[in-house]
């Protein structure tokens, strides 16, 4: 267990292992995999609709599987954040890539990891799948990052990342008054 003092108070971090897969910390993978999937889907040919859906589904399923793996390995008897990943980002301003999961965010991350593949499976084939799936994967990355971030600036970045795909998803694929709803 490691204790980090912040502004007179303290926050306890337990289990500071990286839980590395391929040398990348588990929580970082939960955020980066959907981003990589979104980029790959964006670069694919629009005519390959089935392959686009398959690529998006694979990236989302792997992310979901990693979140369920994290649930299975989560030491519920320990206090503090688990699977912590911290790397200095903009050290002059005290901004870092700081991810962790606790008992509350754990279930939100698993729920996100399980629901997004189901959304991808249930996509309406009449929609333009390529941008829809790219926005969905970007949204998944932003939601995962929002639930996992322990740095306030990083949380703000992920929260903003969530808003951009939501705007386009609602504005392009919503129903009546979708443009009004997207700008609200």
Model-found features: residue ranges?
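Transmembrane helix-loop-helix hairpins at membrane boundaries of multipass inner-membrane proteins
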Residues: 5, 9-26, 43-121, 126-134
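Residue-level recognition of transmembrane alpha-helices
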Residues: 34, 56-59, 112, 136, ...
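Hydrophobic, membrane-inserted alpha-helices
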Residues: 36-38, 116-117, 138-144
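Alpha-helical multi-pass transmembrane bundles of energy-transducing inner-membrane proteins
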Residues: 47-50, 134-138, 142-184
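N-terminal signal-anchor/start-transfer transmembrane helix
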Residues: 29-46
């Amino acid at each position: 267990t490691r204790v980090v003092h912040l502004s007179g108070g303290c926050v306890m971090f337990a289990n500071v292992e990286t839980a590395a897969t391929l040398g990348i910390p588990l929580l970082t993978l939960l955020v980066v995999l959907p981003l990589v999937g979104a980029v790959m889907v964006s670069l694919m040919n629009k005519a390959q609709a089935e392959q686009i859906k398959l690529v998006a589904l694979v990236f989302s399923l792997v992310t979901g599987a990693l979140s369920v793996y994290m649930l299975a390995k989560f030491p519920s008897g320990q206090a503090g954040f688990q699977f912590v990943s911290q790397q200095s980002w903009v050290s002059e301003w005290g901004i870092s890539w700081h991810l962790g999961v606790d008992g509350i965010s754990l279930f939100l991350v698993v729920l996100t990891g399980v629901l997004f593949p189901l959304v991808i499976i249930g996509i309406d084939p009449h929609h333009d799948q390529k941008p829809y799936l790219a926005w969905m994967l970007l949204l998944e990355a932003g939601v995962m990052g929002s639930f996992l971030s322990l740095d306030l600036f990083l949380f703000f970045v992920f929260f903003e990342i969530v808003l951009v795909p939501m705007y386009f998803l609602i504005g392009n694929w919503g129903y009546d008054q979708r443009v009004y709803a997207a700008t609200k």
